[in-house]
Swiss-Prot record:
Residues 468-484 have a biased composition (Low complexity). It comes from Rattus norvegicus. Residues 834-874 are annotated as: CTAD. It is found in: Nucleus; Nucleus speckle. It holds the Pfam family HIF-1a_CTAD. The modification 4-hydroxyproline is found at residues 405, 530. The gene is Epas1. This is Endothelial PAS domain-containing protein 1.
Length: 874
C-alpha cells in the first residue's frame, strides 16, 4: 500500500514539474518575442530594454498605426534623403512645442521626443495612452469636437468641404516645475497648450488589396502641434524691438503699456490708459478677439491669432498677443491680465481711416500746420500762410472746432488777409478809436461810477465801525447788474468780465472797520447750529431785517462788504451795533440831524467805547428789499418787527449794549451820548472785549438764542401797556430798574461785564449803574417823556462821546433807590420778587462752551458726547 502511494505521488509531482517547466518555457519564449518586438521599435536600446510587455505592445501598436498613417499620406515614390534626416533633428529644436498625433478615439499614437522638455512626461510614458487621461476634464468636450470631422471652426469652403483645420486650447498635466524639477504625476499642475493642426483621413488597408469587395471605414487622426504658453514672469529671453508689454484689467482696459508702442503703433501710453482694447481692434477681427478673451478668462492663458490693431494716424498693424491671467496669491482670484504683443508688420494702409480716433489724429496734423502759420521765425510772408490756412479751413470746416479756445486760453485773432475778405461796415461802428482804451479798462478805473449806474441789486448800507447787525440784503463793494443786458457794455457786445468776476468774488477778510456787514441772503439758517438749552426749552431763530424804507442822510455811499464766512454771524456785537442798525433801519424818521449837543445823560460809556469815537454814519439801505437765497433774486420778504414796549419781557445778555428798540414819538427830545464816570471805567476793557465787533471773542449762542426769543415775545407783549407816564406816578427806575439789576445779576453771575467789582463800594450811585443796565437792555423810548440831564455833569466831560444825540434817549431821571434795597445785600436780591413772570436758565460759561459750534463747522454735541459733557458739568 505504501508503495502504491509513493508511485502516485511521484507521478503527480512529475506532472507538476512538467507543467511548470512548460509554463516557464512559454514565458521565456514570450519574453524573447516581446524583447524582439521591443528591439524593432524605433527607440533607443536603453529605453526598449526596460519596457514591460504591456508597454511594448502599446508602443508597437502605436508604431504600426503611425506607419499606416504615414504610408497613406505619403506617396510611395518619395524617398527620404539624407539631408531630410538631418533636418528632422533640427525641426524639434526649432519648434516651440511638441507634435502629437491623436486618433479619433483619443489615443495618442505619436508624440515627439521633446515633449519631456515642456511637460515633464516622456514620450514612452504617453504614447499609446488616451489623451483624456492627461487633460483637464473641462476640456474633454472641446477635444472631442476637434477630433471628429462633423464640427470645427476653420477656413474651409462653406457647405462644400468639411473644415479640417483645428485651433484650440487645452490644459494638460505637467510634472516639470518652473525651476526645472520633475515631480510625481500626482503632484502635476495644468499647463495650457495652444494646439494647431488638421484632421487627416486615411484608409486602413492599402488601395490595391481587397477583401472580397468589403471596404473598411475610413480612419481619421488629428495631427497637431502643441505649444505651451510661457508665463510673462518666467521669460528669460529679452524682448526684441518689435514687442511691447501691456497690462489690462479683466475687461481688457489698459492699465499699463510699454513705451515702445509709440514707435510701433503711434500711441502714447497715456492715451491708452483706461480705454478698452476692443476700441483698437479691427472690426473684422473683433469676433476672434472676443473668443480669445473668453478662452483667456476660462483657461488662464491664451494666444490670439494674427489680428489687426488700428494705428493712431490711420491704417493698422498686424499683431499677435499672448495673454496670461495673473492671480492674487492670497485668495487665488484673478487680478489682472498681462499681454505680450508681437508686432508682425509695419503700418499698412496708413491712408485708410477706419476709426473716429484716427480722424482726430489726422486733424492734429492739420492743426500742427495751422500752428506753424503763427510762427514768425519763418521767412515766408504772413499773407501766404494766411492763404494756406484759409484754403485748409475751407476744405475742412470741422477743423475749426479744434481751434476753439478753452476757458482761460489766450484768444489769438486769425488774420486771413484783406484780399480774401471784405470788411463789413456793420462791425466798424462798434470799433473803438486806436487811442481810446477798451471798455474793460474803463470799467477797471471807474468802479464808483458803475455802482451808481447799476443800482438794482446794490443796497448801500453804511454803519459804524462796529456795525455788525445782520442785513437782509446783499451789499458788496462792487455793483451787481440788474439785468442780463447790464453785463455787456454799450460799445461792444462783450461780457463785462470784471463785473462777472466781482459778482462771484467774496471778500475773505474785512478791509476796514466798516466791513462787518453780514448777509442773511447767502445763509442757510437750517445749517446753522442752534443753541441747545440745559433746561429743555428750545429757542427758535428769528430773522432781524428792516422793513420800512430808510432815508439816506449822507450823499456819499460808504463802502460795503459782503458776508465772508458762516461763522461771522456769531461775532460779538458792539454797543450801538447789535440793535443800533436795526433801530436806525426801522425808524429812520427820527434820524434827520447829526448835530452834537452839549447836554448829556448820566449813562456809562462802556456801551459805546467798544466802537469808534466817531459819529455814527447814516444807514442808507433800502429796508424793503426782500430776503433772497437765490443769488440776489427777490423772493419772500421777512415780516416786519412789532413795536417793543417795556413790559415783562425776557432780556438777552447779548443785547445789553444794544440800541433802544422802541420808536421815538414825534416831539421827543433829542438824546445825548453819556460819559464815563470814574468809578466804572474799569469795565471798559472787559465790555469792549466781550461785546466789541472787532473783539477776539465771539458771542455765545445762548445770547443769540435769548435775543431771538425776545423777538418772539414782542408779539405777545404788543397789547400790554409799556410804562405809566412819569408825570402821574412814581419814577419807573425806583422799582423796575433795581429789580432788573437783580435779574441781571442772577443771569450773568460773575461773568457779566456789567457786574460791579467786589472792590467797588456798595454806596456807589445806583442810578448810574441802573441806567447803564437799562441802557444795555435796550429799553423802548416810545412812551417816555423827555428828561433833563443832571446838573452834576459838565459839558466837557460829556462831550467825550461823539455819538449823534438824536439816536439815544434815557427813560429815567436821576434818582436813588430806597436805602432798604441798597443795604439788603445779595440775599435780599435773590429772594426779592422777579422783574419778569419767569426766570431764564442760569448758564455758566462751561454750559455755553459745550454747546457752542466748533469753528468752521456746524456740528453740535449729540448722543453720547452730549451726555458725557453734561456728566462732566455736574
Amino acid at each position: 500500500m505504501t508503495a502504491d502511494k509513493e508511485k502516485k505521488r511521484s507521478s503527480s509531482e512529475l506532472r507538476k514539474e512538467k507543467s511548470r517547466d512548460a509554463a516557464r518555457c512559454r514565458r521565456s519564449k514570450e519574453t524573447e518575442v516581446f524583447y524582439e518586438l521591443a528591439h524593432e521599435l524605433p527607440l533607443p536600446h536603453s529605453v526598449s530594454s526596460h519596457l514591460d510587455k504591456a508597454s511594448i505592445m502599446r508602443l508597437a501598436i502605436s508604431f504600426l498605426r503611425t506607419h499606416k498613417l504615414l504610408s497613406s499620406v505619403c506617396s510611395e515614390n518619395e524617398s527620404e534623403a539624407e539631408a531630410d534626416q538631418q533636418m528632422d533633428n533640427l525641426y524639434l529644436k526649432a519648434l516651440e512645442g511638441f507634435i502629437a498625433v491623436v486618433t479619433q478615439d483619443g489615443d495618442m499614437i505619436f508624440l515627439s521626443e521633446n515633449i519631456s522638455k515642456f511637460m515633464g512626461l516622456t514620450q514612452v510614458e504617453l504614447t499609446g495612452h488616451s489623451i483624456f487621461d492627461f487633460t483637464h476634464p473641462c476640456d474633454h468636450e472641446e477635444i472631442r469636437e476637434n477630433l471628429t470631422l462633423k464640427t470645427g471652426s476653420g477656413f474651409g469652403k462653406k457647405n462644400k468641404d468639411r473644415s479640417t483645420e483645428r485651433d484650440f486650447f487645452m490644459r494638460m498635466k505637467c510634472t516639470v516645475t518652473n525651476r526645472g524639477r520633475t515631480v510625481n504625476l500626482k503632484s502635476a499642475t495644468w499647463k495650457v497648450l495652444h494646439c494647431t493642426g488638421q484632421v487627416r483621413v486615411y484608409n486602413n488597408c492599402p488601395p490595391h488589396s481587397s477583401l472580397c469587395g468589403y471596404k473598411e471605414p475610413l480612419l481619421s487622426c488629428l495631427i497637431i502641434m502643441c505649444e505651451p504658453i510661457q508665463h510673462p514672469s518666467h521669460m528669460d529671453i529679452p524682448l526684441d524691438s518689435k514687442t511691447f508689454l501691456s497690462r489690462h484689467s479683466m475687461d481688457m482696459k489698459f492699465t499699463y503699456c510699454d513705451d515702445r508702442i509709440l514707435e510701433l503703433v503711434g500711441y502714447h501710453p497715456e492715451e491708452l490708459l483706461g480705454r478698452s482694447a476692443y476700441e483698437f481692434y479691427h472690426a473684422l477681427d473683433s469676433e476672434n478677439m472676443t473668443k480669445s478673451h473668453q478662452n483667456l478668462c476660462t483657461k488662464g492663458q491664451v494666444v490670439s491669432g494674427q489680428y489687426r490693431m488700428l494705428a493712431k494716424h490711420g491704417g493698422y498693424v498686424w499683431l499677435e498677443t499672448q495673454g496670461t491671467v495673473v492671480y492674487n496669491p492670497r485668495n487665488l482670484q484673478p487680478q489682472c491680465i498681462m499681454c505680450v504683443n508681437y508686432v508682425l508688420s509695419e503700418i499698412e494702409k496708413n491712408d485708410v481711416v477706419v476709426s473716429m480716433d484716427q480722424t482726430e489724429s489726422c486733424s492734429s496734423h492739420t492743426l500742427m500746420a495751422m500752428n506753424s502759420i503763427f510762427d514768425t521765425s519763418d521767412d515766408v510772408a504772413l499773407s501766404e500762410k494766411s492763404n494756406y490756412l484759409f484754403t485748409n479751413l475751407k476744405e475742412e470746416p470741422e477743423d475749426l472746432a479744434q481751434l476753439a479756445p478753452t476757458p482761460g486760453d489766450a484768444i489769438i485773432s486769425l488774420d486771413f488777409g484783406s484780399q480774401n475778405f471784405d470788411e463789413s461796415s456793420t462791425y466798424g461802428k462798434a470799433i473803438l478809436p486806436p487811442g481810446q482804451p477798451w471798455a474793460t479798462e474803463l470799467r477797471s478805473h471807474s468802479a464808483q461810477s458803475e455802482s451808481r449806474s447799476l443800482p438794482a441789486f446794490t443796497v448801500p448800507q453804511a454803519g459804524s465801525p462796529g456795525n455788525a447787525t445782520p442785513s437782509a440784503t446783499s451789499s458788496s463793494s462792487c455793483s451787481t447788474p440788474s439785468s442780463p443786458e447790464d453785463y455787456y457794455s454799450s460799445l461792444e457786445n462783450h461780457l463785462k468780465i470784471e463785473v462777472i468776476e466781482k459778482l462771484f468774488a467774496m471778500d475773505t477778510e474785512a478791509k476796514d472797520q466798516c466791513s462787518t456787514q453780514t448777509d442773511f441772503n447767502e445763509l442757510d439758517l437750517e445749517t446753522l447750529a442752534p443753541y441747545i438749552p440745559m433746561d429743555g426749552e428750545d429757542f427758535q431763530l428769528s430773522p432781524i431785517c428792516p422793513e420800512e424804507p430808510l432815508v439816506p442822510e449822507s450823499p456819499q455811499p460808504n463802502p460795503q462788504h459782503c458776508f465772508s464766512t458762516m461763522s461771522s454771524i456769531f461775532q460779538p456785537l458792539t454797543p450801538g451795533a447789535s440793535q443800533g442798525t436795526f433801530f436806525l433801519d426801522k425808524y429812520p424818521q427820527q434820524l434827520e440831524s447829526r448835530k452834537t449837543e452839549s447836554e448829556h445823560w448820566p449813562m456809562s460809556t462802556i456801551f459805546f467805547d467798544a466802537g469808534s469815537k466817531g459819529s455814527l454814519p447814516p444807514c442808507c439801505g433800502q429796508a424793503s428789499t426782500p430776503l433772497s437765497s437765490m443769488g440776489g433774486r427777490s423772493n419772500t420778504p421777512w415780516p416786519p418787527d412789532p413795536p417793543l414796549h417795556l413790559g415783562p419781557t425776557k432780556w438777552s445778555v447779548g443785547n445789553q449794549s444794544a440800541e433802544p428798540l422802541g420808536p421815538l414819538p414825534l416831539g421827543t427830545s433829542q438824546l445825548e451820548p453819556p460819559s464815563t464816570p470814574p468809578h466804572v471805567s474799569m469795565f471798559k476793557m472787559r465790555s469792549a472785549k466781550d461785546f466789541g465787533a472787532r473783539g477776539p471773542y465771539m458771542m455765545s449762542p445762548a445770547m443769540i438764542a435769548l435775543s431771538n426769543k425776545l423777538k418772539l415775545k414782542r408779539q405777545l407783549d404788543y397789547e400790554e401797556p409799556a410804562f405809566q407816564d412819569t408825570s402821574g406816578g412814581d419814577p419807573p427806575g425806583t422799582s423796575s430798574s433795581h429789580l432788573m439789576w437783580k435779574r441781571m445779576k442772577s443771569l450773568m453771575g460773575g461773568t457779566c461785564p456789567l457786574m460791579p467789582d467786589k472792590t467797588v463800594s456798595a454806596s456807589m450811585a445806583p442810578d448810574e449803574f441802573t441806567q447803564k443796565s437799562m441802557r444795555g437792555l435796550g429799553q423802548p423810548l416810545r412812551h417816555l417823556p423827555p428828561s433833563q440831564p443832571p446838573s452834576t455833569r459838565s459839558p466837557g466831560e460829556n462831550a467825550k462821546s461823539g455819538f449823534p444825540p438824536q439816536c439815544y434817549a434815557s427813560p429815567f431821571q436821576d434818582y436813588s433807590p430806597p436805602g432798604a434795597q441798597k443795604g439788603s445785600g445779595v440775599a435780599s436780591r435773590l429772594l426779592g420778587p422777579s422783574f419778569e413772570p419767569y426766570l431764564l436758565p442760569e448758564l455758566t460759561r462751561y454750559d455755553c462752551e459745550v454747546n457752542v459750534p466748533e469753528p468752521g463747522s456746524s456740528t453740535l454735541l449729540q448722543g453720547r458726547d452730549l451726555l458725557r459733557a453734561l456728566d462732566q458739568a455736574t
